[in-house]
């Protein structure tokens, strides 16, 4: 089973049980060295604690063990954690919540010869992201069609 199919299966299985105040942010499945790691990223207002990750792991693990047929080709390690400061913004809802935040947006196709923009997300209407960014010393604004976004995440301003 391809990694994306595994990720989709895990998302479909665990998303109904991750209830407020928690939010399922992302799922990743990858090989690290000789091990497979299934990472489930969960967040809540104010961040999650170690106790939260233990509680969520105890909730999620039996659900994954009950999936039939087993989608995992090998044994894996389950990791439940916070998405961190540079959390991915994978849905329109996540982008809407991120308005006013500093973001990094990678594009499938360049706009004015630029494929990566980093700046303040000032608006998102479901179709277009508006970002204020610094080009050398000049403040600029770019409007990015949502369908051209390859990857978006929160960014840390240094």
From Swiss-Prot:
Q: Which GO terms describe its biological process?
A: ribosomal small subunit assembly; translation
Where is this protein found? Cytoplasm
Which controlled-vocabulary keywords does the entry list?
A: Cytoplasm, Ribosome biogenesis
Question: Which cellular components does GO assign to this protein?
Answer: cytosol
Question: Does this entry carry the keyword Cytoplasm?
Answer: yes
| InterPro entries, per the entry | Ribosome_maturation_RimP, RimP_C, RimP_C_sf, RimP_N, RimP_N_sf
- Pfam families, sorted: DUF150_C, RimP_N
Q: Please give the function described in this protein's UniProt entry.
A: Required for maturation of 30S ribosomal subunits.
What is this protein's record name?
Ribosome maturation factor RimP
Which species is listed as the source? Streptococcus uberis (strain ATCC BAA-854 / 0140J)
């Amino acid at each position: 089973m391809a990694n994306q199919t595994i990720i989709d299966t895990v998302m479909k299985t665990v998303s109904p049980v991750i209830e407020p105040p928690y939010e399922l942010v992302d799922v990743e499945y990858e090989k690290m060295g000789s091990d497979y790691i299934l990472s489930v990223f969960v967040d809540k207002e104010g961040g999650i604690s170690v106790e939260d990750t233990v509680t969520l792991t105890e909730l999620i693990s039996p659900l994954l063990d009950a999936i039939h047929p087993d989608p995992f080709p090998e044994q894996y390690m389950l990791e439940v954690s916070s998405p961190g400061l540079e959390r991915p913004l994978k849905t329109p809802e996540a982008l809407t919540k991120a308005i006013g935040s500093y973001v990094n947006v990678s594009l499938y196709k360049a706009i004015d010869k630029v494929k990566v923009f980093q700046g303040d997300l000032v608006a998102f209407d479901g179709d277009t992201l508006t970002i204020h960014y610094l080009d050398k010393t000049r403040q600029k604004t770019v409007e990015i069609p949502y369908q051209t976004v390859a990857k978006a995440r929160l960014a840390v301003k240094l």
